[in-house]
Amino acid sequence: MSDGSLLDELGWRGLIQLSSEGLEERLAAGPISGYIGFDASATSLHVGHLLQVFLLTHLQRAGGRPVIVIGGATGMIGDPSGKSSERNLLDETAISANSASLRAQLERFLDFSDGPTQPRMLDNRDWLGPMSVLDFLRDIGKHFTVPYMLAKDSVQARLAAGMSFTEFSYQTLQAADFLHLHRHEGVDLQMGGADQWGNITAGLELIRRVEGRAEGAEAERAEAEG
């Protein structure tokens, strides 16, 4: 399978619900690096992660390079997408243990042999952790308007019940991940569940604003399959 037929394969399997403009052209241009994030908020993968792992394996078989991001940083906050109430915050000891467990499980599903499709497994604590609040607000936060953030479905669903600034800011952290990976790992593709669409498009918008061009692409599996 080639990158160019990846969309056909995933579409045939009913795994694409939404995708960004230009994705088809980017896949046709040559091999692509794509990522999915797994927050370290639990000790194990669950059945909801199955199709995300499935997407990564299909990407690798198509000649692309999977990039797995363990959310050691974002897992300390918790993604509000699809949640009716705020998660309990975990301490660093629990996050570290969860990260190690997720790494061990994910290594079973992909081929880590040397080569152009060899997966990368990263932890976003490595780049988000050292960033100060002032640096984050200056370099990332200034590119997001409050109306833009409020319009996200994950935010709208929680406004009436109350939402902390911690959870409200989650989309900017995930966007910062996409920007970092785009710059340092050559990642142009982010994949995720239907509930991640707002976070994915936030990353695309950040890349567009910071890099000064509409670059990057993402695909999303069907919500009905998740």
Sequence positions of predicted segments:
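NTP-dependent nucleotidyl-transfer catalytic core
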Residues: 1-225
